[in-house]
């Protein structure tokens, strides 16, 4: 076995790699409003923030479990609010999560069925699109 970047194993067993997805940046119009949505509706936790009051301000958030997070950033020439689409949150109990999100006032689609599993979609206050899903999505 060899050791690659950041001490991750390389080669060998399926699933070994030199990197993993860490953070996806999402442009939002109002970072404080977006933070409240991600905390209060989705249950995300704030993991860090910086450069407040500048065009480079960011807030790092992540779901209660999992290894990847999202960074709420200010709009810029390359990223505008509402452009991030299809980000997926995997769950083991889609009915329970769907009901909980509806109870919090979130506009969410009915649960649908696809060849890979069951899903529902919603958008954050800036129009960035999310999917909650259960099924054979493991990579």
PLM features: what roles do these ranges have?
Residues 4-35, 84-87, 133-139:
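N-terminal beta-strand motif that seeds the catalytic metal site of vicinal oxygen chelate
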């Amino acid at each position: 076995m060899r050791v690659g970047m950041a001490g991750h194993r390389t080669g060998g067993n399926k699933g070994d790699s030199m990197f993993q997805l860490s953070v996806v940046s999402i442009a939002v119009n109002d970072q404080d409003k977006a933070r409240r949505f991600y905390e209060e509706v989705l249950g995300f936790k704030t993991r860090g923030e910086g450069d407040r009051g500048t065009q480079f301000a960011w807030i790092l958030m992540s779901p209660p479990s999992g290894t990847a997070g999202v960074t709420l950033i200010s709009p810029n020439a390359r990223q505008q609010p509402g452009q991030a689409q299809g980000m997926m949150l995997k769950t083991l109990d889609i009915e329970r999560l769907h009901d909980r999100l509806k109870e919090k006032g979130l506009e969410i689609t009915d649960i649908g069925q696809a060849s890979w599993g069951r899903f529902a979609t919603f958008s954050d206050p800036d129009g960035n699109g999310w999917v909650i899903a259960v099924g054979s999505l493991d990579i």
